[in-house]
């Protein structure tokens, strides 16, 4: 799908990808057929094959687009943040930004990526997952080293908790509800920081 450039109209191909992403998120990949997507788009199945070889190709492009966008946001934060706490806060909230504005893509990332991991064209997902883990663990280790975070922190355990706290939220969070994803993220972040940061008294003990 095209990057977030509102001034540039979406191509027909982009529109089909967005439609497919919504259907995959709502119904699941297995339950969504090429004919379903074509019918919803008001075209024949053969016309859809003119743009994509298979629904797996569509999922691949949806996931590549999402992960490229996500890691672009992460890198922007890492390039401007000046402390481990600021980096962690920025990455945490960027994840909830994704849940708000790229909800269907996040659902697919959570529900379908692991099932597709045996297909070679989806190797990039595991590569990105490893990069994401290293990014978070490095920040946590940096925070332990400079005294921002507790010295007894199990950084791998905390990373897993943060990962699950953020991405699993997409299973129950629905855009347009009483709370925005940013509000949910801020409350979750307060819980996380309450458990990993040192108080001033602890720092000087």
From Swiss-Prot:
Keyword match Repeat: no
Pfam families in the record: TetR_C_24, TetR_N
Domain of life of the native organism: Bacteria
UniProt KW keywords: DNA-binding, Repressor, Transcription, Transcription regulation
DNA-binding region coordinates: 33-52
Keyword Transmembrane belongs to the record: no
GO molecular function: DNA binding; DNA-binding transcription factor activity; transcription cis-regulatory region binding
An individual GO BP term: regulation of DNA-templated transcription
PANTHER family the record matches: HTH-TYPE TRANSCRIPTIONAL REGULATOR RUTR, HTH-TYPE TRANSCRIPTIONAL REPRESSOR KSTR2
Function summary: Controls the expression of a small regulon that may play a role in the utilization of cholesterol.
Assembly information from the UniProt record: Homodimer.
Name by which UniProt lists this protein: HTH-type transcriptional repressor KstR2
Species this chain originates from: Mycolicibacterium smegmatis (strain ATCC 700084 / mc(2)155)
